[in-house]
């Protein structure tokens, strides 16, 4: 008997989420409105941050954040190459240059030392990445950014619910979270910008909605004049209340969802111990891991087959997997522009990374199924 296909990720959506979305549909106000305002308030309260601004995607959030920081043609932004390519794309589309740095081979995160070595006279910002639910060594990065007077914008797309040295990621400084369909907290598409910089937050809020000082719901609820004025040209990155309502329920469930992810990840670590799979290493500092992804490194010499063949073998057994990620500088567009750039750790991992199924609705026997499939694949290659 064939088993149902097990995807590498699936959103955990229950009756409460469905009811919340239905309530918005019946309310007559489905775009940006009261659900957005509540989501921003609840998210800021959870993190203990000063400002939270909801947007339609983390890519859009990064776009307006860098724009609000004044980044444009001739500027440089330091970021790890081993991340989703949207970061490099946004920097490039602003007319700036992404300066790619290598990552630690085992944690897949960049160090303060690597970032500082890449700083030049045109460096205007640093965009480091919290990876797979694990956390950057923020103290070192904050010290470097402060010493050079450079903006630090944390890519926290993988880190909703993560903690660094006892405090939530995003409690201090500026960070961007993703609510994409596979993230720990999802509303299908969405994001949250957080910051303790009031001027930056105000400009991000303005730029996300046409450069207007207020949105339609703000004008309605506060009795302001019906025609708002453009303060500066902006974009259309506001989050609909349909999405915000879904995110609010997910935010209430976040601790339970992440606890389940942790339990599943711990079971994987137990079951796969001793196999030549090289799961990611953990940083030395105290943290709470959100376990957004469970990543293996499939080395052909150690495992008897390469990553792509391993993924095909999983697929043949009804198990999905993913690659997070191919380093940005290896993509055609960026390789053409920086043909000599060599980042050994990013390149080594790009050829070996494999994300296996991890999502809260997985059963314990799903972990056993994946583990047995992996054992079978490796055994056949010995």
UniProtKB/Swiss-Prot annotation:
Gene3D superfamilies, alphabetized: Aspartate Aminotransferase, domain 1, Type I PLP-dependent aspartate aminotransferase-like (Major domain)
Example GO molecular function: UDP-4-amino-4-deoxy-L-arabinose aminotransferase
The EC number(s) this enzyme carries: 2.6.1.87
Pathway(s) this gene product operates in, as recorded in its UniProt entry: Nucleotide-sugar biosynthesis; UDP-4-deoxy-4-formamido-beta-L-arabinose biosynthesis; UDP-4-deoxy-4-formamido-beta-L-arabinose from UDP-alpha-D-glucuronate: step 2/3; Bacterial outer membrane biogenesis; lipopolysaccharide biosynthesis
Cofactor: pyridoxal 5'-phosphate
GO biological process, one term: lipid A biosynthetic process
Protein's job: Catalyzes the conversion of UDP-4-keto-arabinose (UDP-Ara4O) to UDP-4-amino-4-deoxy-L-arabinose (UDP-L-Ara4N). The modified arabinose is attached to lipid A and is required for resistance to polymyxin and cationic antimicrobial peptides.
Self-association state and partner proteins as the record states: Homodimer.
Name of the protein in its database record: UDP-4-amino-4-deoxy-L-arabinose--oxoglutarate aminotransferase
Natural source organism: Pseudomonas paraeruginosa (strain DSM 24068 / PA7)
Gene: arnB
């Amino acid at each position: 008997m064939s088993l149902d296909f097990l995807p590498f990720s699936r959103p955990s959506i229950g009756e409460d989420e469905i009811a919340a979305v239905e309530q918005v549909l019946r309310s007559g106000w489905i775009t940006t409105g009261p659900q957005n305002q509540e989501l921003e308030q609840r998210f800021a309260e959870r993190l203990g941050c000063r400002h939270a601004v909801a947007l339609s995607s983390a890519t859009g959030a990064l776009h307006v954040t860098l724009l609000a920081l004044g980044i444009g043609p001739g500027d440089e932004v330091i970021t790890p190459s081993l991340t989703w390519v949207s970061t490099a794309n946004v920097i490039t589309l602003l007319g700036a240059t992404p300066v790619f740095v290598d990552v630690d081979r085992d944690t897949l995160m960049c160090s303060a030392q690597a970032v500082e070595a890449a700083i030049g006279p045109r460096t205007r910002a640093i965009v480091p990445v919290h990876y797979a639910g694990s956390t950057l060594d923020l103290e070192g990065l904050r010290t470097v950014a402060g010493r050079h007077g450079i903006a630090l914008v944390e890519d926290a797309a993988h880190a909703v619910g993560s903690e660094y040295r006892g405090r939530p990621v995003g409690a201090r400084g500026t960070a961007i979270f993703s609510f994409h369909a596979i993230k720990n907290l999802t509303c299908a598409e969405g994001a949250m910008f957080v910051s303790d910089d009031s001027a930056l937050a105000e400009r991000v809020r303005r730029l996300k909605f046409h450069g207007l000082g207020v949105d339609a719901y703000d004008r309605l609820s506060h009795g302001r004049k019906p025609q708002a004025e453009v303060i500066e040209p902006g974009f259309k990155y506001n989050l609909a209340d349909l999405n915000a309502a879904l995110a609010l329920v997910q935010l209430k469930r976040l601790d339970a969802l992440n606890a389940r992810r942790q339990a599943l990840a711990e079971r994987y670590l137990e079951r796969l111990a001793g196999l030549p799979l090289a799961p990611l290493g953990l940083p030395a500092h105290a943290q709470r891991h959100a376990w957004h992804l469970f990543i293996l490194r499939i080395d052909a010499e150690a495992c008897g087959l390469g990553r792509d063949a391993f993924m095909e073998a999983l697929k043949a057994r009804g198990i999905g997997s993913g690659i997070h990620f191919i380093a940005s500088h290896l993509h055609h567009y960026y390789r053409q522009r920086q043909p000599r750039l060599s980042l050994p750790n990013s390149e080594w991992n790009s050829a070996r990374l494999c994300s296996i199924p991890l999502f809260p609705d997985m059963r314990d026997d799903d972990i056993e199924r994946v583990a047995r499939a992996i054992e079978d694949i490796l055994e056949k290659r010995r």
